[in-house]
Amino acid sequence: YASRGLGDVYKRQGLDSLLTVQAAFMDDTPRLTGAINEMAAECEQRVEAGEGVAPKGTKRILYTGTPMAVPNWKLFNLIEKAGGVVVGEESCTGSRYYKDLVDESGETVDEMLDAIAERYFKINCAVFTPNNQRMKDIVQMAKDLHADGIVDVALQFCTLYEMESFAVEKAAEEAGIPFMHITTDYAGEDAG
């Protein structure tokens, strides 16, 4: 998943990658694991053949902001239909779902519970304050994925992400990364 945004060969559309992660919320684990292994093999074949889902030079976008509830994927569709590629997303319906896995080295129940708690305390959601680490994570992710820009999205009723968008914009500006904030809702009227 993380490798989709690396290199010049775009192995999968950003929306396809997001759907794969979102399927993990609800799908049968053995079936999902098999499907992911098949997709990984397909991606490796594409890299070997030099075939990607977007041409070299395509603008690389990092998505951040409000989680995208199934099936609200219009921003990914708009970005990719406009000729960009979403190389990563920083949201709890995307990379936050599997980032910072649970340390499995605990030997006692208390150590195991502490490890689970530690993993969840590392999640940088907009509901936490101060939230400087989320700004650092977004900028670092954009740099790691060689993003050409950050698109920050907030649903109209998601006040926490709306408020935090100012801090995200400031962090992106300080890092020299182009930034765009979009306020939207679940309606399709702004989808073109």
Range-by-range predicted roles:
Residues P67-P130, R134-D137:
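Redox- and metal-dependent alpha/beta enzyme cores, enriched for Fe-S-associated oxidoreductases
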Residues G65-V70, F157-M163:
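Gly/Ser/Thr-rich loops at beta-strand to alpha-helix junctions
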